[in-house]
């Protein structure tokens, strides 16, 4: 039965076969984790952002308007983006994860070219979008959506439509 569900997802969500673009960790202390990852693994530079208002123009939880905030730091390890997230406030997938598991790897991110089309496919596949947000690019583009896949796949999947341009980070570590 479970293999049938996975095959169904492969056919309905072909963008998942492109490979994992991002691994994300939910942590208690963003700054401390970034410094540790830089010292231990040589990962950096890290770009810091606070997601929520005013950066995000759209925020939803289970399809309804929501408000939440989190600090994130982004970097790369090879071709894979590493995202470190510190939950700040609101009802989020991060708070759910912390409550259920504590801190650790919370989701895998997959790139999509067209979020509207991807979300239509998600609906057709029978998956639930638990949290989404967007408008964080300088041109009002960029969107993310979390799918309830933990029970099925052992982790949450995030769909990511990157903005064409990024806002300048609040800070960079280490300073270049």
Regions found by a protein language model. Give the residues of each.
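Short acidic/polar alpha-helix capping motifs at helix-coil junctions
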Residues: 1-2, 33-38, 82-86, 109, ...
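Vicinal oxygen chelate
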Residues: 1-13, 20-28, 72-80, 97-114, 116-176
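Extended intrinsically disordered, low-complexity coil regions enriched in Ser, Thr, Gly, Ala
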Residues: 31-52, 99-103, 111-137, 169-170
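Short, surface-exposed, polar/charged, turn-prone segments marking secondary-structure boundaries
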Residues: 53-54, 73-77, 103, 110-114, ...
């Amino acid at each position: 039965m479970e293999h049938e569900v996975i095959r169904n997802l492969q056919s309905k969500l072909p963008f998942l076969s492109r490979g994992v673009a991002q691994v994300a960790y939910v942590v208690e202390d963003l700054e401390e984790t970034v410094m540790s990852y830089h010292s231990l693994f040589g990962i950096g530079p890290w770009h810091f952002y606070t997601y929520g208002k005013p950066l995000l123009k759209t925020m939803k939880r289970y399809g309804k308007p929501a408000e939440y905030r989190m600090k994130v730091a982004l970097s790369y390890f090879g071709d894979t983006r590493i995202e470190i997230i510190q939950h700040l406030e609101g009802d989020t997938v991060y708070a759910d994860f912390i409550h259920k598991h504590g801190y650790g790897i919370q989701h895998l991110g997959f790139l999509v070219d067209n979020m509207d089309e991807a979300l239509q496919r998600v609906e057709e596949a029978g998956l639930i979008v638990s949290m989404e947000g967007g408008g964080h690019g300088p041109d009002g583009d960029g969107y993310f959506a979390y799918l309830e896949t933990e029970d099925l796949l052992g982790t949450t999947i995030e769909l990511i439509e990157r903005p064409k341009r990024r806002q300048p980070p609040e800070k960079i570590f280490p300073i270049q």
